């Protein structure tokens, strides 16, 4: 009888295990239309914000930099670095429409290929998935 009971308990406790996940956390919507253009001597990023209330949200902008010429592997995985962590009220962001935002990256150099991703985070630090990748070759 003890063997049967142990077997039942063992079988019921088996199953797919996963990391704990709080179902009540509301993650911000990920950006899916990130784009990059050359504007003057800078690269301007643009995207649509899907959240209606941005007062408590923060933005993280990530950038990867590769030399266009040389021995860098363009198809290799990229290393992205945080270049800005901003609130949506920051003067470095420009609203061009009700949900359209732009950011000017002035820290670019000629002869490099730049790749960008962004994430939107709530006040608790819970972030959306990374956006699509926007790339720009800076002359």
Language-model features, listed with the residues they occupy:
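Pro/Thr/Ser/Gly-rich low-complexity, intrinsically disordered linker/stalk tracts
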Residues: 15-57, 110, 125-139
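Recognizes extended acidic, P/S/T-rich segments that occur
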Residues: 58-109, 126-132
């Amino acid at each position: 009888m003890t063997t049967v009971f142990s077997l039942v308990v063992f079988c019921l406790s088996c199953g797919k295990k996963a990391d704990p996940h709080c179902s009540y956390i509301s993650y911000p919507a990920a950006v899916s239309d990130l784009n990059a253009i050359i504007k003057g001597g800078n690269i301007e990023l643009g995207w649509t914000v899907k959240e209606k209330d941005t007062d408590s949200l923060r933005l993280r902008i990530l950038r990867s930099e590769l030399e266009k010429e040389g021995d860098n592997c363009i198809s290799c995985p990229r290393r992205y670095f945080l270049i800005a962590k901003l609130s949506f009220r920051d003067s470095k962001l420009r609203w061009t429409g009700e949900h359209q935002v732009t950011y000017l990256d002035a820290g670019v150099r000629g002869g490099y290929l730049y790749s960008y991703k962004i994430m939107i985070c709530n006040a608790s630090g819970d972030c959306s998935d990374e956006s699509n990748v926007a790339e720009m070759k800076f002359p």
